[in-house]
Amino acid sequence: MNIIMVDHMKYQHNITSEIINNIPVIYIEGDLTSDADGDAKNVYSEVKEKYSPHKVIINFENTKYINSSGIATLIHIIQDVNERGGVIAFVGLTEHLKKVMNIVGISDFVQMYNSNNDAVKTV
């Protein structure tokens, strides 16, 4: 499991990953901002190098806040997965985060599920 925890004065985040049924799940806890950008990309890169996955799940159950830098990070990951012919799923989005994903158009490129189990069964 990859674990990166950062606690800045304004933003806090914890980005981890695990494998469920051979599918990497990346957990984004706290805030997905420019402070988390490098850590999110590093965890994704480690998962990519180790497992070369064609399916990736990103779990937002404990994500509190996302800004434009966080959106850019997600777009980077989505593009990379799509370029390799893969599928990406988002799990546990709040209604607010779903609305944000719809507004910026990300929801057109990912599958959305309520739980890891739902995503693992379908992806």
Regions found by a protein language model. Give the residues of each.
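Residues that form or immediately flank small-molecule/cofactor binding pockets and catalytic motifs
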Residues: N22, E95, N117
